[in-house]
Swiss-Prot record:
Gene Ontology molecular function terms on file: oxidoreductase activity
Pfam families, alphabetized: CI-B14_5a (PF07347)
Protein family according to the UniProt entry: Belongs to the complex I NDUFA7 subunit family.
Intrachain S-S bonds: none
Modified residues (N-acetylalanine): A2
Phylogenetic placement of the source organism: Eukaryota, Metazoa, Chordata, Craniata, Vertebrata
Residues bearing PTM N6-acetyllysine: K40
Subunit structure: Complex I is composed of 45 different subunits.
Cellular-component GO terms for this entry: mitochondrial inner membrane; mitochondrion; respiratory chain complex I
Name of the protein in question: NADH dehydrogenase [ubiquinone] 1 alpha subcomplex subunit 7
Keywords associated with the record: Acetylation, Electron transport, Membrane, Mitochondrion, Mitochondrion inner membrane, Respiratory chain, Transport
Membrane topology: Peripheral membrane protein
């Protein structure tokens, strides 16, 4: 990168009314301090900084299948068949999204196509 000569630097400094090369490298004001205070976090299950293993704070280990509180279905007793299983199996028909399709009949007049 090209730099200006001493005369050009002096001319720019004189025209601007201040020293432009004084803060050339540190041109950003928002530089944080090297020593930071410890963060003020709310107390929770993982607020400890030591002896806080990942496996103890993992929420997936606490997830379980849902427990059934109440069911509208009747529970069968082990070893007994269902009371109306034979009747219910014969009454059910296949579910279709539309009314049944009519079967087309071939024409009865001569000649057959």
């Amino acid at each position: 990168m090209a730099s200006a000569t001493r005369f050009i630097q002096w001319l720019r400094n004189w025209a601007s009314g201040r020293d432009l090369q004084a803060k050339l490298q540190l041109r950003y004001q928002e530089i944080s301090k090297r020593t930071q205070p410890p963060p003020k976090l709310p107390v929770g299950p993982s607020h400890k900084l030591s002896n806080n293993y990942y496996c103890t704070r993992d929420g997936r280990r606490e997830a379980m299948p849902p427990s059934i509180v109440m069911s509208s279905q009747k529970v069968l007793v082990a070893g007994k068949p269902a009371e109306s299983s034979a009747v219910a199996a014969s009454e059910k028909k296949a579910v279709s999204p539309a009314p049944p399709i009519k079967r087309w009949e071939l024409s009865q007049d001569e000649p057959y196509l």
